[in-house]
Design a protein with these regions (language model features):
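NAD(P)H dinucleotide-binding glycine-rich loop of Rossmann-like/cofactor-binding domains
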Residues: 72-79, 87-158, 302
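Short amphipathic alpha-helix with an adjacent loop that forms part of the alpha/beta core around
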Residues: 207-217
Length: 337
């Protein structure tokens, strides 16, 4: 059997700010051989998420940091090419923590999920946008904590991103009025015209507190926060009575490591509001419920997904940096094969 070549990107030093070329190295090794109970997966798409940048810092998080010399962690999708595990057959499509790697080993555990249906018929890009951690995060954050009701006003930051674009559409399906916050006219146009938001505020060019007052005259009932920082503070200043603030991400501080405290947090008390952080991995046992709802809405034509696709493993670091420079709309993917 010819040996398969496996190219991977490993961490060489801790980045400061954006990931620099010398922070990582592209290495070539042999693909691993599956042992009993394991299968070998050839990665087709690597998903690029802002959280992946936080795993490169030597800081405690819900997952341990990537060690120097280790493959950079990322969630991806691929096809089983060899199996010694009863849970997987050759040709199955699987979502797992592929990392920045062309091949990876999976076991029958919570880090790998077979995608139902014949492998060649699976829309892998839709799976990465809707039926993986991204879709589950939008679903559980919006339905479990946000709980939008018909007629309520929902605000979503990073509304043009992978999670935000889906979260806002879930709120629309619930009958809420949805206002996005995004950076730049092109993103704001996509948020309204593609993702179906009622309005979008351009935080780079608009006066945010004034725009929130205009678009949310009765206040904000639900805020789905992906950014933290001054944007979170501005929305906290506009909360309605009994508002729910969903803390999903803090992309504004992932590069700096600084977390300026929101001065308007006192409004949580004044408005008897709730602010709650969450991680979709806590709901792992209910992912099927999320995907069933998302599949139903997708089949009914109620969900739109968009991907920004880079080509080749060499592009992984550029794709990750692109999340922090505002380069991408929708889910960022790198196609490997």
């Amino acid at each position: 059997v010819p040996t398969l070549t496996n190219r991977q990107i490993v961490l060489r030093r801790r980045p400061h700010g954006l990931v620099a070329p010398e922070d990582t190295e592209l290495v070539e090794t042999s693909a691993p051989t599956p042992a009993d109970g394991e299968a070998l997966v050839r990665t087709t798409y690597v998903g690029i998420d802002a959280a992946a940048r936080t795993w490169l810092d030597d800081q405690p998080s819900y997952l341990p940091p990537v060690a120097i010399g280790e493959v950079i962690r990322a969630a991806g999708i691929g096809v089983v090419v060899e199996s010694r595990c009863p849970a997987y057959s050759v040709g199955d499509v699987v979502t797992t923590l592929t990392g920045f790697s062309e091949y990876t080993i999976v076991r029958d555990d919570l880090f790998a999920t077979p995608v139902p249906g014949p492998g060649e018929q699976v829309d892998q890009r839709a799976v990465m946008s809707l039926y993986g951690p991204t879709g589950a995060t939008a679903y559980f954050g919006m339905t479990g904590i946000g709980k939008p009701a018909p007629g309520e006003t929902v605000v979503v930051s990073a509304a043009g991103g992978a999670t935000g674009s889906v979260a806002g559409q879930i709120a629309r399906i619930a009958g809420a009025r949805v206002v996005g916050i995004a950076g730049g006219p092109e993103k704001c146009r996509a948020v309204v015209e593609e993702f179906g938001y009622d309005a979008c505020i351009d935080y780079r060019n608009d006066d945010l507190p004034a725009a929130l007052k205009t678009h949310c005259p009765r206040g904000v009932d639900v805020y789905f926060d992906n950014v933290g920082g001054p944007i979170l503070d501005a929305v906290l200043g506009r909360l309605a009575h009994k508002a729910r603030v969903v803390l999903c991400g803090v992309i504004s501080s992932y590069l700096t490591g600084e977390h300026p405290g929101p001065a308007n947090y006192v409004n949580l008390l004044a408005k008897t509001a709730l602010m709650q952080g969450f991680n979709a991995l806590d709901e792992w046992g209910r992912f099927d419920e999320a995907f069933a709802a998302l599949r139903r809405w997708d089949a009914e034509g109620l969900l739109v997904h968009r991907e920004h696709v880079y080509e080749g493993i060499e592009s992984c670091v550029d794709a990750l940096n692109g999340l922090f420079t505002g380069a991408n709309i929708g889910k960022t993917l790198v196609r490997l094969g």
